[in-house]
């Protein structure tokens, strides 16, 4: 197993909560990556989506999934870095995810993301990007 860190964007975490076509491949991929991180923003996104789309059981399952993900606080440095990203079409929340991932430095092996714009921005920033299917 790898000691390196993998960053999970909200789009990846959601696929662990809801049964989607990519869920089995993602779950298998993550077996090799026990060190999983996401922004605290991701927790908010995931729980809001769980409440909007699911019920109390889904929200409880989302909380269980999130216990396996270390959350990185979106501090002033990360927010400033997100605001300074060059990609003009990158949405605000996605820029925070990307800035958080970039803040991890050389310990970051890559980012798991299913959102096309964020995936392209992460690649442009030089990150390894995965979207297991």
Per-range role (PLM):
Residues 1-38, 51-61, 126-127, 133:
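Short, well-structured N-terminal submotif of metal-dependent ribonuclease cores
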Residues 1-5, 38-39, 102-133:
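Acidic, PIN/NYN-like endoribonuclease modules and their adjacent C-terminal/linker elements
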Residues 8, 38, 73, 92-95, ...:
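Short beta-strand scaffold positions
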Residues 11, 47, 63-66, 83, ...:
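Amphipathic alpha-helical segments within well-ordered protein domains
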Residues 12-13, 42, 78, 97, ...:
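Alpha-helix capping/helix-boundary segments
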Residues 23, 43, 59-62, 79, ...:
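A general structural signal for well-ordered alpha-helical segments in protein cores
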Residues 32-33, 68-69, 107, 125:
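Structured helix-beta-strand junction loops
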Residues 67-88, 94-100:
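Acidic catalytic patch
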